[in-house]
Amino acid sequence: MKSERFRTELITNVSHDIKTPLTSIINYVDLLKADNLSEEEKAQYLDVLDRQSGKLKKLIENLIEASKASTGNLTVCPEPCNLNILQAQTAGEFTDKLTQAGLELILRKQQSTPMIDPNVDNADLPDLVITADSRHLWRIFDNLMGNICKYSQPGTRVYIDLATVDQCAQITFRNTSQYPLEQSTDALLERFVRGDSSRSTQGNGLGLSIAKNLAELMNGTLALHVDGDLFKVIVTFPLAIEEEYN
């Protein structure tokens, strides 16, 4: 019953996002049929077609992945995954997008003990290793960072924090939203709304849902915390047993 409701809401909530790039593609194909176009105009129209077809392709991929993830119909290949390396790789991958969005990314490695200030990075702490599917784990990071780049207030700092809590690795993504966050966290995860009631921003709201389902497929959890315009996503996985990766 839940998976059936998921599919129904999935189709309903993203239908507008499918129509937008599709309509644009149809319109620009018609424009290209004109006989009196200059080479510059043709190049501009082709550029729009390239961008819109890319958006449509990405949306279809997200729809397929969201459906598979919600039903557990995805292959999981567990292996040791170093979160410190992934944290650094994420910073590198998103350098350009963060710069374009006017955001500063802060990476921190923390340990939840009274002996260490959780607000101070400690390079001597051991790396955090979990057992997960590296492809799905990257997709979680990619989706969450994509949301951060789209919806954060320009000129603010965003954070990816690593911490150990009760034999678990905890990854916290934190940012300041440029849109009101009035919806409940359940609504943000279950109904694919984006945090703003309008549809003036890009995206289809599937990223959080996909990330949550992927985390759960790998024995992890994903939780949201909203405090005014402050938005946190906390992803938690059991730490790998040392024998598994040594």
Regions found by a protein language model. Give the residues of each.
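Short alpha-helical segment of the dimerization/phosphotransfer core of two-component systems
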Residues: 51-56
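Short conserved segment of the HATPase_c
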Residues: 180-193
